[in-house]
């Protein structure tokens, strides 16, 4: 292998909002924050939980609120 062409590895800590922390090696940074992880994700826990931190559902409903009414006016 060639020397000095590979990125440096740092020990990184991944922190979730639920309090779970994990250590891994990364070339990007030393600390990573995430909103959801395997410790609190509904698929892995078996518990139903509504996850919409960015308000995406509200934005979708607002964007397409008049979609059905507009298509009836056009005659489609």
Swiss-Prot record:
Record keywords, A-Z: Metal-binding, Ribonucleoprotein, Ribosomal protein, RNA-binding, rRNA-binding, Zinc
HAMAP family given in the database record: Ribosomal_bL31_1
Required cofactor names: Zn(2+)
Subunit structure: Part of the 50S ribosomal subunit.
Molecular function in Gene Ontology: metal ion binding; rRNA binding; structural constituent of ribosome
Domain of life, source organism: Bacteria
UniProt cross-references to Pfam families, sorted A to Z: Ribosomal_L31
Ranges annotated as spanning the membrane: none
Function text: Binds the 23S rRNA.
Family as reported in the entry's similarity comment: Belongs to the bacterial ribosomal protein bL31 family. Type A subfamily.
Entry's Gene Ontology cellular component terms: ribonucleoprotein complex; ribosome
Origin species: Maridesulfovibrio salexigens (strain ATCC 14822 / DSM 2638 / NCIMB 8403 / VKM B-1763)
GO biological process annotation, one example: translation
InterPro entries reported in the protein's UniProt record: Ribosomal_bL28/bL31-like_sf, Ribosomal_bL31, Ribosomal_bL31_A, Ribosomal_bL31_sf
Residues annotated to bind Zn(2+): 16, 18, 37, 40
Protein known as: Large ribosomal subunit protein bL31
């Amino acid at each position: 292998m060639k020397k000095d062409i590979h990125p440096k590895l740092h020990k990184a800590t991944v922190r979730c909002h639920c309090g779970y922390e994990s250590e891994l090696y990364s070339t990007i940074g030393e600390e990573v924050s995430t909103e959801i992880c395997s410790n609190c994700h509904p698929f892995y826990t078996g518990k139903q939980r509504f996850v919409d931190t960015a308000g995406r559902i509200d934005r979708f409903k607002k964007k397409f609120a008049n979609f059905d009414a507009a298509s009836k006016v056009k005659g489609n």
